[in-house]
Amino acid sequence: MSTALIDVDSMEPSLQSILDQKSLRWIFVGGKGGVGKTTTSCSLAIQLAKVRRSVLLISTDPAHNLSDAFSQKFGKEARLIDGFTNLSAMEIDPNGSMQDLLAGQGADEGGAAADGMAGMGGMMQDLAFAIPGIDEAMSFAEVLKQVKSLSYETIIFDTAPTGHTLRFLQFPSVLEKALAKVSQLSSQYGPLLNGFLGGQGQLPNGQSLPEMMEKLEQLRETISEVNTQFKDENLTTFVCVCIAEFLSLYETERMIQELASYNIDTHCIVVNQLLFPKKGSKCDHCDARRRMQKKYLDQIEELYDEFNVVKMPMLIEEVRGKEKLEKFSEMLVKPYVPPEADE
């Protein structure tokens, strides 16, 4: 009997519950590197677009695989995905977001250097990047800027590998520390900075120090509001993606424990790249790998008996392009049935 079949009493082995939960506003998809996070997030976005007014898919992974998945170039501005009328995507560069904040939009770097200001901008940037997790925090700040100007019903995050994802979720406290540090420096070295900046007291981007502080304070208030939403299970959930191997299972357990410490809801796990050897198969390698996968699948079902555990098969070709993603996405809501289960 195939291990892909689940007892009737178990949680439904699909992500249908996410589609049915109309109140969800924020959905994170994350896990260890190389387990199929991007494929899963793209596929979930496609399914959500069928039942939501508007969906935004965002990559916060520096690798930025959304463009490869949909065979379409995306950038830091939300853009409709070809073939859809209500599904958009964007890829955010955390470093670029920070540089925009510090250097200012459209700042003339050559002119700044000529005025002796370039060094000041570099110092501020070095100071900012010295704060742990600030790159992820600014990545989210860029997201908020987009989301506030465009009203999306649901936002899906294709996150960076596990460690970065968990740091990303600490951004409110990170920005609190950043603001405290800047305030401290401003009060301690304000006169010195004003003397260095000249009579107008302007930073390289043309802003004054108080203006920059005011913008950061507004950003902090917005992020605090969103952080409250993140801890509301009616508005936010996290989908864990893994494969049936020891390291991936270990990372998933660590991530679930840490999400719980942040009070962030998670009740769905997608297990990718599962082998389902055909009856009579003579592939010893396939059988051995299947036995290993079964061992870890059994552990997943035992550990997470109150989760929706979705089991996705290993495919013979890459899942790239709209048509293949749509086909893959169907298996997220309609459990995959191995060929031998039909007999």
UniProtKB/Swiss-Prot annotation:
Active site as annotated: 61
Compartment(s) of residence: Cytoplasm; Endoplasmic reticulum
Annotated residues for binding of Zn(2+): 283, 286
Source organism, top-level taxon: Eukaryota
GO BP terms in the entry: cellular response to oxidative stress; pheromone-dependent signal transduction involved in conjugation with cellular fusion; post-translational protein targeting to endoplasmic reticulum membrane; response to heat; response to metal ion; retrograde vesicle-mediated transport, Golgi to endoplasmic reticulum; tail-anchored membrane protein insertion into ER membrane
EC number: 3.6.-.-
A Pfam family reported for this protein in Swiss-Prot or TrEMBL: ArsA_ATPase
Residue ranges the record marks as coiled coil: none
Positions with a binding annotation for ATP: 32-39, 245, 272
Family matches, as InterPro entries: Anion-transp_ATPase-like_dom, ATPase_ArsA/GET3, ATPase_ArsA/GET3_euk, P-loop_NTPase
Family recorded in the similarity comment: Belongs to the arsA ATPase family.
Protein name: ATPase GET3
